[in-house]
Amino acid sequence: MGKYFGTDGFRGEAGITLTADHAYKVGRFLGWYYNMIRERNNDHEPARIVIGKDTRRSSYMFEYSLVAGLTASGADAYLLHVTTTPSVAYIARVDDFDCGIMISASHNPYYDNGIKMIDCYGEKMPEEILLLVEDYIDGKLHVFDKDWPELPFAHREHIGCTVDYVSGRNRYMGYLISLGIYSFKGVKVGLDCANGSSWNIAKSVFDALGADTYVINAQPNGLNINNNAGSTHIEGLQKFVVEKGLDIGFAYDGDADRCLCVDEKGNVITGDHILYIYGCYMKERGKLLTNTVVTTVMSNFGLYKAFDEQGIGYAKTAVGDKYVYEYMAKNGCRIGGEQSGHIIFSKYASTGDGILTSLKMMEVMLAKKMPMSKLAEPLKIYPQVLENVRVTDKKAAQDDEAVQAAVKAVAEALGDTGRILVRESGTEPVVRVMVEAPDHDTCQKYVTQVVETIKSRGYGV
């Protein structure tokens, strides 16, 4: 995408590559821009922008900076305080906000942070607006048919208000609870909140639905978000589920837009498992619209084999829940997601929602009266080997004729027993080489073959 904004917002190390000044300028632009849009529509009420944040120490700094920018431009800032990314998307949509902002770096360590921008439909902000924000940050804004070297400041009664809007977060929790069509009474559930945004939401939702809820990593201190916790460090939840004799466990990331599960035996249930389980559940009930589950190119080869066996169609998008949702919206699909646990249920949400995902997995377990291990059993995950090759030129390495010939040779050798995927990293000088095959040795052999070709062509660093 642009200079600052990637597919998941403006992200960087707090105070280094993402500063309070950046956040202030984001607020200044958005407050001014949406007020201008309103004025052009003969609406003279101030723009309304809702803000949420995760538990990082720096999130407070960025929240205050955004509020300063928004109110200086005459917009009203509504604060959800610590909450999840999907809650901001939900409230932005149902409460008719001009846009929403989430302060989070998702699964990254505490010293990183990010600014995610959400439009009035609860979807990721259109790229053209993000590029205007970048232009303003860089002092070269041109919009509404003129250059804007400086933006006007609001004054007197036109300075924006700041509104405590924790009631919005509570209504989001009520919405989640309303989606629980079965009582969870008697079900022992473990939750790993990653010391992040879900710490003050997830347990309340499960308790309200009657579960016996056990929680780990729900004591945020500003520095421990995702620290050996949550969906990227699921081994802690695996141990917890087994030791406590729980029926199921759910692990969220820092802003709770993703979820992975642990079955009653301590096995990890990935995003691919979730797509398979819910896809089959929907098909059985005649509710899998278009008979299609949307995946990304990183989903496991075994998932597609399993879908073929069940007569379920699938689509593959580029990596990123942004691309998954775009395909779903365009083609009327009900479920899609990523192996990492970003799962989108388009009937209920416009973004990945970890807590919603866990509720849907509970629904399938209770409807089918089966433990998670049995629901996941038909999906045979193929062994996978992934190697990141640091290169001098990502595009040249991937387009090289000898490299392409090596990739083609592997694909032909695997046939319908596996697959090879070679792609550029979107954020690093890296080419990723991934092979899935019936056994680990075969994966490693073919990955090594392609990696050595890349290096022998002089692209390796």
Task: State where each predicted segment sits.
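An N-terminal, well-structured beta->alpha segment
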Residues: 1-68, 72-73, 162-186, 395-396
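Gly/Ser/Thr-enriched, mixed-charge loops and adjacent short helices
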Residues: 13, 113-242
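N-terminal small/polar loop signature for handling phosphorylated ligands or for N-terminal nucleophile
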Residues: 36, 40, 48-112, 204-262
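Short glycine-rich phosphate-binding loop at a beta-alpha junction
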Residues: 42-54, 188-190, 291-297, 432-434
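Proline/glycine-rich low-complexity loops and linkers
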Residues: 80, 131-173, 178, 264-337, ...
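Gly/Ser/Thr-rich active-site loops/lids in small-molecule metabolic enzymes
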Residues: 126, 215, 267-286, 354-364, ...
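Phosphate-binding and adjacent anionic-ligand microenvironments
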Residues: 248, 285-461
